[in-house]
Each structure stands twice: as structure tokens, then as C-alpha cells.
């Protein structure tokens, strides 16, 4: 079955795997999803990711991160810009929850967090927010 919103599929798979206490989850590969995974590793929301090329199709295996009490490191992950209603922000992007969480943006300079976009003075499409 074709997926119309691959970013929503990406964050839903991560959220569901975390809620089910799975150690890993597999996501169909795209360069954007690989860049998102790299960013989530840098910010400490997931342990690691591996791109696996199989005979049928490539995918990304994400190793999820949990707290000492066994709760997922990702408390909340929500899609902001959707196919039916795109959401763009300029260089004056506000902090998410006063800086506790992050907005992830797709910009002309690649996938960035809200803090990085403010520092570089650029805006972009707000893909999702994460806490």
C-alpha cells in the first residue's frame, strides 16, 4: 500500500515502536529520513541508525533510546506540516516549549533544528516537533 505522507509514516513508526518498548524499528529508506535519523541521533532522541540495503528494498533500522526507568526518550513527536496544509516559518521562528523541545525544519541548507535555523538566520518548512 503506497504511503502518501512518508514523514508522518516515519514518526508514527518511531512513536509506535517506543510505546511498544521495541528495541528497534525498520523504516523504508529515503535520503530525507536518513538525514532526520542523523539529526535525532545528534540530539540524543535515538541511540543509532543503520542503513540496510537488502535485495528487495533498502531500509533504515533505528535503535530506540529509553530512560533508566524504561520509558522512551521521545515523549512526544507530532507532525506539523501536512500534505493538505503546509506550514512554513521564517527566520524569527519561536522556541518550542521555551526550548525544552525541538522543531525540525526542512530548509534550503538541509534538515535543521529550530535553534540551528535561528542561528543561521533562515526559515523553512516545519516538518515535526519533538519533546
Swiss-Prot record:
InterPro entries: Ribosomal_uS8 (IPR000630), Ribosomal_uS8_CS (IPR047863), Ribosomal_uS8_sf (IPR035987)
Lineage of producing organism: Bacteria, Pseudomonadati, Chlorobiota, Chlorobiia, Chlorobiales
Disulfide bonds: none
Origin species: Chlorobium phaeobacteroides (strain BS1)
Subunit comment: Part of the 30S ribosomal subunit. Contacts proteins S5 and S12.
Keywords, ordered alphabetically: Ribonucleoprotein, Ribosomal protein, RNA-binding, rRNA-binding
GO biological process: translation
Domain of life: Bacteria
Role description: One of the primary rRNA binding proteins, it binds directly to 16S rRNA central domain where it helps coordinate assembly of the platform of the 30S subunit.
Family: Belongs to the universal ribosomal protein uS8 family.
GO cellular component terms attached to this protein's record: ribonucleoprotein complex; ribosome
Name of protein: Small ribosomal subunit protein uS8
MF-aspect GO terms: rRNA binding; structural constituent of ribosome
Amino acid at each position: 500500500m503506497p504511503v502518501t505522507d512518508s514523514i508522518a509514516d516515519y514518526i508514527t513508526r518511531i512513536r509506535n515502536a517506543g510505546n511498544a518498548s521495541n528495541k528497534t524499528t525498520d523504516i523504508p529508506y529515503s535520503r530525507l529520513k536518513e538525514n532526520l535519523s542523523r539529526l535525532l541521533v545528534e540530539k540524543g532522541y535515538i541511540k543509532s541508525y543503520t542503513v540496510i540495503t537488502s535485495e528487495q528494498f533498502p531500509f533504515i533500522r533505528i535503535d530506540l533510546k529509553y530512560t533508566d526507568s524504561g520509558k522512551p526518550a521521545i515523549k512526544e513527536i507530532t507532525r506539523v506540516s501536512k500534505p493538505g496544509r503546509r506550514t512554513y516559518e521564517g527566520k524569527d521562528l519561536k522556541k518550542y516549549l521555551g526550548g525544552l523541545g525541538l522543531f525540525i525544519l526542512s530548509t534550503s541548507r538541509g534538515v535543521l533544528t529550530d535553534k540551528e535555523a535561528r542561528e543561521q538566520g533562515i526559515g523553512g518548512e516545519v516538518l515535526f516537533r519533538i519533546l
